Regions:
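Acidic, metal/ion-coordinating pockets
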Residues: 2-406
Length: 406
């Protein structure tokens, strides 16, 4: 049964060809390609197309666009016992996501099984049927490890997806649907080991089995593709600047195994940027198109509670003092965002930059322009958090409406 399912999925994904990309993008013969990546996308209103009015034309001019899907897409919802804050949307939102220019979605989210296995499988099915590439999740462990290798004008790009923020039972196993895992292990070590009750240092490490599998997958992808991109749903949400140890380990090991670019998401705020061995790591791309919490109407009805008054929401807001001063659902730095950009030439990444962006009231994200105070705010914020993690923001150079990294 599993073999037939895997073969059907591979056949369906192979039918999504470069010709399908060209049908909705302005592809011309050119000497370089553009890859774009965003953080979390979670849509919760009637007119889904409204979200992308400010970025649609730019995204459709790119050759390949990646996004992180943050919500379950199904009308068959039953809250999982592990769900903290359920996130769902109607499957029709994929029409707007595709129309906006997205080509690849990771579903390696901590919300992937918020509404159980049926809704999870519905989401996978709808993504594939929409003609979008899927990475990071599957109907079982073998399928969850599959990743698309996309032929873009003769350049093959592999996009691998992993999830680290995994409630119990959310990672895929041999006969269990779920996320392709890149779990972390936490150790708490007392600062003064001889005095019980003293504060502790926190260390995190990659799960050894997941790390080995990730390295093997990247090495395998290296033999199939010209460009290998790794996507991780990881980190600590809402905690300014902080990068955990396990994130750095996974990112560095991925690059050592052959990855050309690492992109992170989940934290709902921007995180630092690192250049390691000449390769760029975006530790967190932040929210890209996320509806305000008070508008998660269907999820609140299913839970029978306003999310903002729930215990899980109170626990989340305790992580950051920024929740105390915000005038919106999330801390104000959650609305500073970016689009990661890579230029590919002669089957290599020859340049990486980011485009400052902002998520305003109304959730219609726009790209900032030089002279816009939000442009400067994003640039200064990224410089600050990067320096806070002992990384070098001095390499970032503003060039027109983007910030060059390499």
């Amino acid at each position: 049964m599993c073999i037939f399912l895997l073969n059907d999925i591979i056949s369906l994904e192979k039918s999504i060809t470069a010709a399908a990309l060209a049908a909705r993008k302005d592809h011309r013969m050119k000497d370089q390609l553009t890859f774009l990546a965003t953080g979390d996308v979670g849509l919760y209103r009637d007119n889904f197309f409204e979200y992308f009015v400010n970025v649609r034309d730019y995204f459709r001019s790119a050759d390949l666009v990646f996004g992180q899907l943050e919500s379950v897409l199904s009308d068959r919802l039953e809250l999982s016992s592990c769900t903290r804050m359920g996130c769902s949307s109607r499957p029709e939102c994929l029409e707007a996501i595709k129309d906006a220019g997205f080509d690849v979605l990771s579903f390696a989210s901590n919300h992937a099984l918020d509404y159980g296995r049926t809704a999870f499988k519905d989401t996978l099915k709808y993504i594939r049927e929409a003609g979008l590439y899927l990475t990071g999740a599957g109907e079982n462990e073998e399928i969850a490890r599959q990743y698309p290798v996309i032929d873009v004008e003769g350049t093959k790009v592999a996009v691998l997806g992993y999830g680290s923020i995994l409630p119990q039972g959310f990672w895929a196993e041999e006969a269990r649907p779920g996320v392709n895992p890149a779990r972390g292990i936490t150790a708490y070590v007392p600062v003064e080991h001889d005095q019980p009750g003293t504060p502790c240092r926190i260390y995190t490490f990659p799960h050894p089995d997941d790390l080995k599998r990730m390295q093997a997958q990247v090495k395998e992808a290296r033999t199939k593709a010209d460009i290998v991109i790794c996507s991780f749903h990881w980190g600590i949400h809402f905690k300014e600047a902080v990068i955990t140890d396990y994130e750095r380990y996974y990112a560095h090991f991925a690059i050592d195994a052959g990855a050309d670019l690492v992109i992170g998401h989940h934290q709902h705020i921007l995180k630092p940027i690192e250049v390691y061995n000449g390769k760029v790591i975006f530790y967190g791309l932040g929210n890209f198109c996320m509806e305000e919490v008070m508008n998660f109407k269907r999820d609140q009805e299913l839970k029978g509670q306003d999310m903002r008054t729930s215990k899980s929401h109170r626990e989340m807001t305790a992580i950051s003092d920024a929740f105390k001063t915000t005038t919106r659902s999330f801390p104000m730095d959650s609305y500073l965002t970016m689009v990661a950009k890579a230029i590919i030439k002669d089957k290599k990444i020859v340049g990486v930059s980011y485009l400052p962006a902002y998520l305003p009231v109304g959730s219609q994200t726009y790209l900032c322009k030089p002279g816009d105070e939000r442009f400067d705010e994003v640039v200064q914020y990224v410089n600050k958090i990067t320096a806070a993690m002992d990384l070098d923001p001095g390499i970032f150079k503003v060039e027109g409406d983007e910030v060059r990294i390499i």
